[in-house]
Amino acid sequence: MHRLFILRHAKAATHPPTASGRDHDRPLAARGAAVLPRVARSIADQLEGHPLDLVLCSTSTRTRETVDLVAQAEPAVAAARLKLDDKLYLADPARLLKTLRKVHDDKATVLLCGHNPGLHQLALLLLGDDGSDNGSEHVLARLRYDLPTAGLVVVDLDGSWTSVGTGPGIRGAKLRAFVVPSDT
């Protein structure tokens, strides 16, 4: 079994615009940075003492800052191999799945940090209608509504990374947790 942590970047600054004027370069807002220690605790809880093997992160400033601040608060994230990938910037679910399918199966736990709407759509795709068999139907219903900034979705996946997201209804993907920082 593999565990996937899907983390949307924390709240980014909107004004003033960056010197470059590019969305890619927007940093985190102070309130976005402030919630990340709580997100780090949630990741630690869901790792259950196991190491985090790999962090896949968009190259945008806000995603890199999100991962950096989570790593400062959680040693397992700091110890994980970090791979920055410019193809994850505003990636759609197809691109995200392509990236996940390249992960080696010896990586049991992977954190993917990126952007909506792709991350939200990926989580919904993986979970389909059968993603909750552990009494978390209300949590899955809430996730269908939104993946907010700094939202964390933890999914357990059967099978290999190369087969993630294949087949109708994506059988074998189970929602383990959906954490919204304002709830912690």
Residue spans of the language-model regions?
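Residue-level preference for the first positions of well-ordered beta-strands
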Residues: L4, T109-L111, L152
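Short phosphate-binding loop-to-helix
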Residues: K87-D105
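Glycine-rich phosphate-binding loop signature in dinucleotide/nucleotide-binding domains
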Residues: Q46-H50, V103-A108
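A glycine-rich beta-strand to alpha-helix segment
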Residues: A108-D129
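Short, well-ordered alpha-helical microsegments
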Residues: T63-T66, P93, L119-H120
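Domain-level recognition of soluble alpha/beta enzyme cores
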Residues: D130-K174, F178-P181
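Active-site-proximal alpha-helix that buttresses catalytic centers in soluble enzyme cores
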Residues: H2-R3, L7-K87, L127-D133, L147
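Conserved histidine-centered catalytic loops in small-molecule metabolism enzymes
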Residues: L52-E74, G159-T184
